[in-house]
Every structure is written in structure tokens, then in C-alpha cells.
Amino acid sequence: MALTSDIVESWHSPRRVVRRLRGAGRSEPVVFTFLFVFLLLAFVSLAPYLSRQAALNPDVTLYQRLFGAGLGLLALVPFFYLLAALGHLVARLMGGTGAFYDGRLALFWALACSTPGMLFLGLVRSFMGDGPAVTGMGLGLFVAFITLYSLMLREVEGQ
């Protein structure tokens, strides 16, 4: 299936989708692509807010803000790999039987599935600025991500 169709399906059947992705065979480039899609769309979701901030405070240009955000997101790549390994090790302590690859698949796919919410959050944040509504939306998105990740990790670890 297409990536977008799988993302939509993951919101109502995350275990089935991650099972299908795992059954398609082990492919590190595919898993890295999921992480890259997340990072790219995270960058896109930040752009409207950074544009607003550049208009409100022209001391730092939009290009400088975008460059900093892009470098910051790229710097997170090793962190996500470590987070996936930690998730796998915790699952292993709880009786999981998967491999480190399965932990990466679960985390990176859950991150990719959270991108529609991130894009919406970025849009709202660019219109409203920071405030309680944006904080509440961010918290809701975080809870949705944790739910997706825990269900997917549980599936790939065989629990």
C-alpha cells in the first residue's frame, strides 16, 4: 500500500499495519525512510511558526530560523536510534522476543504516523502562537504517539 494509506490505516489498526510492514521483509533503508519522512514533515510543520516568529522579531531572519531548525532535527537522528534501542531493551525485559530492527520499525513508523497531527499542530501554532490551546493539542498528539508506539512495539516484540 501507499505510505499515506498505511498512515491512515495505522490510526485505527496500528498492529495490523506494523505486522504487514514487518512481514514485508527486513529492510533498513525502508525503516530509515520512515524516520526521514517524519523529520522532513516535522520541518515543514515548523516553517509557518518560524515565519511568524521572524515577522514578529526580525533580528533573526527566517532563513536563519529554518536553518537552525533543520540542523536541530538532523541532530536528533542518533537520539531516535538510541530511543528505539531503549524501547526494544525495555520490551525484552518484559518478555519481548523481537530484534533491534523491530524496535526501530515500531518507533520510526509511529513517528511517521504522528505527522498528520504534527502538521495540524504547526498550522494552529502559526495562527495562534504559543498558548494553552496549542499546549493541549501538543499533549494530545504526544498521548496519541505514545499509544501508537506502545501498540506497535507490543506487536513487533511478540507480546
Predicted regions and their residues:
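Juxtamembrane loop-transmembrane helix junctions in multi-pass integral membrane proteins
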Residues: 26, 59-62, 129-132
